[in-house]
Amino acid sequence: MDSRAGNTADPRGGRRGGGLQGSRSPRARQLLERLDARPLAARAAADLTALVRKAGATLRLRHTEGVSGLDSADIEVTDSRLPHATLVKHRPQHQRSETLGTWTEPLPVTQNKASYALKVPQATGRFSVELTRGPAGFGLTLSGGRNVSGDAPLTVHGLLKDGPAQRCGRLQAGDLVLYINGQSTQGLTHAQVVERIRTGGPHLCLVLQRPQDMDGSRIKEVGGHRKTDRSLDPRGSRVESRSTISPVHHRPKTRTSPRPSPEAVAIGHVVRAVEHPTEDLENRIPGTPGPWLVPSEDRLSRALGVRGGGAQLALEMAAGRRRH
């Protein structure tokens, strides 16, 4: 074992290093990722000792500054039995989450293709999309804002062809934009939204919601109100449909005819005076009143005070026709 690896003797034949040469203040994040092209993250101390013993006659370690959960390192293993020294270089292919302790594949990020992360909270129906700016921007247009159409909601107006938003495959025209880069869009003007996207950097994180998911309950309520409106009308038609009804139907409600005098009843004018409210109510021909509008002779005789019943009333009516 080379003395450069440490200066403390190990009773089992090795030397326990007290620090790396050339590193005056080693940091905790200066970790070795691989030894002899083998990962160290899931190995125990006894396994590390065995690997060091199998490394050869000389072991040289060169650390690099930590930039992630597992730092990259260049490891050189020299053995007198080998003609030349072997240099093993490794760059981290995975990214480790320090808080969760899980391994996740890194997202490929290019300039021409958007990389996005989709999260769908089932409770709220919202989802988030992360886009990367391309040569022509993010590839979407927005509409709405506080000064547009009286505080209209901010929505996705359209997607540019072959843009990052269209290649994402998650966005649709009409989606409601609730958050931009973690900040709510409520109360923002259209100019403020554009400025926030422009100054947000090469990445854009949007939290959206489908209109049908948000307005499902509202549509049910509106349908319930419409049903109530139809039940109020005894004919089963909508209140708005009354504007299309012929004006003849409104005449019996708006026009009131004076009560006929007894003389008019005697000469038969009462039929023509009461005929008008019944016109076109059930597609009847005007001038043909229903049977309930023709008074009986007994009622007419009692109303006019004519004695003798129907015979005397017929004589009076005949005399009236002759006079007129």
UniProtKB/Swiss-Prot annotation:
Matches recorded under InterPro entries: MAGIX, PDZ, PDZ_sf
Bias-annotated ranges (Basic and acidic residues): 216-241
PROSITE patterns: PDZ
Chain positions covered by the region annotation Disordered: 1-26, 216-263
Residues of the PDZ domain: 128-212
Modified residues (Phosphoserine): S261
SMART domains to which the protein is assigned, alphabetical: PDZ
Source organism, top-level taxon: Eukaryota
Entry-linked Pfam families: PDZ
SUPFAM superfamilies linked to this entry: PDZ domain-like
Keyword vocabulary terms for this entry: Phosphoprotein
PANTHER family, sorted: PDZ DOMAIN-CONTAINING PROTEIN MAGIX
Descriptive protein name: PDZ domain-containing protein MAGIX
